[in-house]
Amino acid sequence: MAPNYFQKPEAALKRAEELIQVGKESDALDTLHDTIKARRHKQWTTVHEQIMIKHMELCVDLKKQHLAKDALFQYKALTQQINVKSLETVVEHFLKLAEQRTEDAQKQSIEKVEEIGDLDQGDVPERLLLAVVSGAAAQDRMDRTVLAPWLRFLWDSYRNCLELLRNNAQVEQLYHTISRHSFSFCLRYQRRTEFRKLCDLLRMHLNQIQKHQYAPNVNSFRVKLTSPESLTLMQDTRLVQLDTAIQMELWQEAYKSAEDVHGMMQLSKDKDKRTVKPSSYVNYYDKLALVFWKAGNRLFHAAALLQKFIIYKDMKKSFTQEEAQEQATRVLLATLSIPEGSDLPSDLSRNLDIEEQHVANMRLLSNLLRLPIAPTKVGILKEAARIGVPEAAGQVAKDLFKLLESNFSPLRVAKDVQSVLDTITRPDHLQYVESLQAVAAVKALKQVSVIYEAISWERIRKIIPFYHDLALERLVVEASKHRIVKAQLDHRADCVRFGSSDATLAGGVDEYDNNEGFTGDDTQLGVEGVRNHLEAMYTRLRVLVEGLDSEKRRKEIVKKIENHVTSYEKNRVTEIERIHRRKKMLENYKENWERVKAEKAATAATEQAKREEAARAEEMKRLDEQNKESERKRKQAEQEEIQKKIKRDQLHKMQQNVIYQAIIKEKGLEQFRDMDPEQVLREQRERLDKERAETQRRLQQQEKKFDHHIRALHLEEMNERRAVMHMRLNEAPRLHEEYENKRIEKEIAAHENHVKLWSMWDQVREATLDWVETVKVENQENLEKKISDWEVKLEAVRNSRLAERAEKRKKERKEAAMQAKIAEERKRREEEERARQAVIDSQRRPHGERGQRREMENSAAMQDSDWRRNAPPRDSMPQREPRPMRDGPPREPFREMPSSKADTDSSWRSSAQPTRKPDDRRSDDFRRDDGPRRSDDHRRNDEFRRSDDFRRNDDFRRDGPPRPMSKADTDQKWERGAVTKTVVSPPKTENQPAPAAEAPKADGPRRFIPPALRNKPAGGGDEQPAPQRGANVTSPPDRAPGLRGPPGPGGRDLPPRDLPPRDGPRDIPRRDGPRRDGPNRNSGANNAGNADSANWRR
């Protein structure tokens, strides 16, 4: 933890030296580290550099890597704008110390192992036991003890320094120097894992440079990829990386490093073609050829060497004859060692249908060699012949080229190649011997297949002397497998047969089978083979003819030479003048080109100087602006500090307030100190207002939300259950399959156990049967005697049981006859009892059509028992004027509460359209005699039956489609909140014809149902059963069918027949019970049936 006081850098350095002298290096390191991290003095001085050097020495001595990293990053921020050279000095000194300590640790480890104790005394038991248990040598154990910590420290130092200096153009040279030292460290100590991490780290740094290349305000000192110096440094570092990977034999990392080098060269070439030197390309192709050779890719190895030879050939000044011969020989040997079909996909790729992957890999490798297309052996040979590689190669390579490419001698080619290969002595050429032997063997085998249909195995061994029997047989099989030749080994005849056959691997599956004259090589018979043989025969015959006519041809040649001499003498002067003119013209062209080139160079140098001057001026301007900006920020920071201090004082004074105490408890003291007091009050006020509004809104919505909460939970539960169901359905097949597999395994195991048990019991059974037979034979006489006795006893038992069975059947028949007689007598007595009871019932007074009287607790009339006590009659409702109920004023709601949708949707009861009378065809639908009855309807059945000659007050609408109607349809005050709608009744007609009575039809027109009631239960929301056929859908549910009659003239109800006069007192109790203060129990919406159930009684 940093101290609460500050020391000057000079005092801190002096204090650290004093602590070091007394042996307190850790305290000295803390003192110097606190000084580096202090924010008081951010201006660099030479004392800071001395402090950093001492700090690095202490970090190395104490192995404090994290403190060194922190101090270096702090020092970078201090010296970035002022003195970057000081940072480089500190970093170099730090790495030098770490490397020196690592070397000392290595020497110390070796010396400790070399120290030998008493020669007369052998190894102590502890040392022997340690060697056996660890399984490592003494040097390895000592390296892990002494050297490993310093290796880890040095690796962390390299990595931290690279992270410190990345993407900084001012220290780019030091960055690449440290990178190369890191590669040397990995190579010297064979740190393969660290080498891979280092390569990944450098790739990540390059990606970051490319990412932030054009990003604004990221880093003013970032590396620019347009700089040739930066690109050259990166390219050289990648070449060192590739060389290190090859030396460490990390071929996978070598291939990745080759890709990195190729990417850097492409990037440099895009920026400036002159950036990449030819020597860099030569080194790159040389390393890449080695990587391809180690990977076993002979084709791209030869292509890389050919590219290297082309670069060498362009460098005419530094390319001597010896170097040209050496490079050409190597290129030609590498090309000749390419096996057949190396550019084609393997059989495995064709069988797995991944040929596109092979093509993509070939294209990628071709890009690494800067080739437009994938190379082939034929293409490489043609390119080598074009640039004169065979002519420039050595004699050995020339002889091999002639033998393998332009020679048809199947019986001698392998021996001739072997004799040439024996002359190769150079180590870099000996690596191609094995490949050349394989190519020569395949070549000989192909040429032999042209001449012979079958050849003995002994002769094949003499023709191809490179291999023993097993290797030669493998060669023949591989050649046939890869469609190079069509051959089969006949071990019975001890020979090799050539040609297509179903028994060969190549027979019947190759695309070349349909081609005429398949041979696998253009030197074999076929169309192309015949042409080549004819050409060779013509050449040899022409040579023979020239030898026979040599004298004649000599005279013709001499005459031709004399003609050339005569022509030369005649045109000599003209040709000499033409040659001189051409030479002078070339010299003038060269002088003009050099002059233009010098002028362009001077112009470029002038422009470069101007750009550098402009850059320096821009840099100075930027530094001035940066200094001004720093000064402005410093003053602004001071002002902000003063304001914060004033604010803290104010907050400290107001902390005793209750509001502030609550805020402190809620947000914490630290956050409270950074807040504005007025802002705190404003936030507190807004929060209280928001809480109050939220509480009010919650109270208002609580009533709505409460009813839908359970429904929402059910909906969510349905979704969850559906998801679980789908999951179980998806899992069911797999579980079933697992269960079936386990069951089958169990059944198989059980079956095996049963089979095993059955075999055991079968053996026991056979032994038992044998034993039984033996016993039978031994006791035959005794057995026969016992059998005869048993038969006698059996006959006696059979006779006794037959007698018992006959007696039992006789008793059963007697009992059955007695039971039938008793049942017939009981049936007769029951019939007599029923007849007697029928006579008694007929003599009783009939009850009529009325049913049994309903119990008091189930009847509203029975509950109101005033009429039983001879109490004065009460009116069920106050008398009202005879007017349509829709003409009255709307009734005000009796309480204020939010109305629901069911309360406001009254279109089905308060409709403005008057109700029509149904058609006469459905006249029975409006009777109340055929519907379901209540239990007490039999009491007033004769009194309340409607007459058929009654007519409704809307008979003028009989010509239109009818619908049922009740008084509730015309009453506007039956429901609270209903909208007042006035209906104007049409004029009544006197002589309106009455409808003819028709029998009701089962398939007549449907009853009218208002839209608001469709798909809903009747009663406006209450769960009630639908009305029966013939019942009015708008009738109150507390009245039985047939109870209500149509209104008479004037809008009043007509009194039913056999009733007392309308104006007189009535002793009939109300069927709906006395009126209560609460809503009617039979209403659809708590008061829907009041008007309809009471007006008719007036």
Curated annotation (Swiss-Prot):
Claim: Zinc is one of the keywords in the record: no
Annotated Gene Ontology cellular component terms: eukaryotic 43S preinitiation complex; eukaryotic 48S preinitiation complex; eukaryotic translation initiation factor 3 complex, eIF3e; eukaryotic translation initiation factor 3 complex, eIF3m; multi-eIF complex
SMART domains hit by this protein: PINT (SM00088)
Domain PCI: 324-503
BP GO annotations: egg-laying behavior; embryo development ending in birth or egg hatching; formation of cytoplasmic translation initiation complex; translation reinitiation
Residue ranges of coiled coil: 574-844
MF-aspect GO terms: mRNA binding; translation initiation factor activity
Region (Disordered) residue spans: 599-648, 805-1098
Residue ranges, compositional bias (Polar residues): 905-914
Skewed-composition ranges (Basic and acidic residues): 608-648, 805-857, 877-895, 916-978, 1054-1079
Quaternary structure, from the entry: Component of the eukaryotic translation initiation factor 3 (eIF-3) complex.
Role: RNA-binding component of the eukaryotic translation initiation factor 3 (eIF-3) complex, which is involved in protein synthesis of a specialized repertoire of mRNAs and, together with other initiation factors, stimulates binding of mRNA and methionyl-tRNAi to the 40S ribosome. The eIF-3 complex specifically targets and initiates translation of a subset of mRNAs involved in cell proliferation.
Protein name (Swiss-Prot/TrEMBL): Eukaryotic translation initiation factor 3 subunit A
Species per Swiss-Prot/TrEMBL record: Caenorhabditis briggsae
